Amino acid sequence: MRIILLGPPGAGKGTQAQLICKRYNIPQISTGDMLRAAIREGTELGLKAKSVMESGGLVSDELIIGLVKERIAQPDCVNGCIFDGFPRTIPQAEALEKEGISIDHVIEIDVPDEEIVKRLSGRRQHPASGRVYHVVYNPPKVEGKDDETGEDLVQRPDDQEETIRKRLASYHTETEQLVGFYQGRAASGENAPTYDKLDGLRTIEDVQKDLFNILDK
C-alpha cells in the first residue's frame, strides 16, 4: 500500500502520516532523508547527488526517482510506504508512473489558507528545550514565557506570516497541480490510485478516522 498525502504546509499531514505508519507498519519516506542517507553511505546515486549539491545545483527528478526505487526495494517497504514531500510536481508524478512505481491512495487534506496562517503564525518555541506552544490552541501559563523555566518564547522565522504566505503561494503554484493530476488518474479507473479529499479543519481524531476508513477498504 503506497500512499501520497497532499495538502498545504500546516494541514496536519505529518501528524496523520505518523498515525498511518504506526497502524499499518509502513515507513514514511522523505526525499530529504533519502538524499542524506545516500550521501552518507556513498552510494553511486548519493555521490552524484553530492556533486550536484556541492556545485549549487538542484538534484534532478531522475536522480530522486532513482533514490525512490532503491528505497522502496528495502525490506521495511514490503507492506508499502507513505511518500513525504514527494512528488511535488506533475513531471515527478509522471516519472513515478514511467518507472512503474504504482500508487494506491492519494489523499488530500484540505485546509484554507487563512486557517494555515493562524495555525502556524501562532506557534511559539522555547529555544533551549524545543518546547512548542500556540497562542490560541496551547498557550503557555504566562504569555510569552516557557512554563518550566519562565524564559522567553520566540517565533521561528518559518512561522512568521510573510514566510507562511510564500510557502502557501509555492504550494498553490506547484504542488496543488497534483490534485488535478491525481483526480484525473483516479477517474480513469483501472490500475489508478484512489483519490479522496478530507476536511482538515476537523480534529486530528476525526481526520484520522476517515483516513483509516479509506485505507482499510
Swiss-Prot record:
Broad class of enzyme this protein falls into: transferase
UniProt EC number: 2.7.4.3
Chemical reaction(s) catalysed: AMP + ATP = 2 ADP
A molecular function (GO) term: ATP binding
UniProt: ATP binding residues: G10, A11, G12, K13, G14, T15, R123, V132, Y133, R202
Main localization, broad class: cytoplasm
GO cellular component: cytoplasm
Renumbered residue ranges of the record's region LID: 122-159
Pathway: Purine metabolism; AMP biosynthesis via salvage pathway; AMP from ADP: step 1/1
S-S pairs: none
PROSITE patterns: ADENYLATE_KINASE
InterPro entries: Adenyl_kin_sub, Adenylat/UMP-CMP_kin, Adenylat_kinase_CS, Adenylate_kinase_lid-dom, P-loop_NTPase
Keywords: ATP-binding, Cytoplasm, Kinase, Nucleotide biosynthesis, Nucleotide-binding, Transferase
Binding positions (AMP): T31, R36, G57, L58, V59, G85, F86, P87, R88, Q92, R156, R167
Subcellular location: Cytoplasm
Subunit-level organization: Monomer.
UniProt function note: Catalyzes the reversible transfer of the terminal phosphate group between ATP and AMP. Plays an important role in cellular energy homeostasis and in adenine nucleotide metabolism.
NCBIfam families tied to this protein: adk, PRK00279.1-1, PRK00279.1-2, PRK00279.1-3, PRK14527.1
Name of this chain's protein: Adenylate kinase
Gene that produces this protein: adk
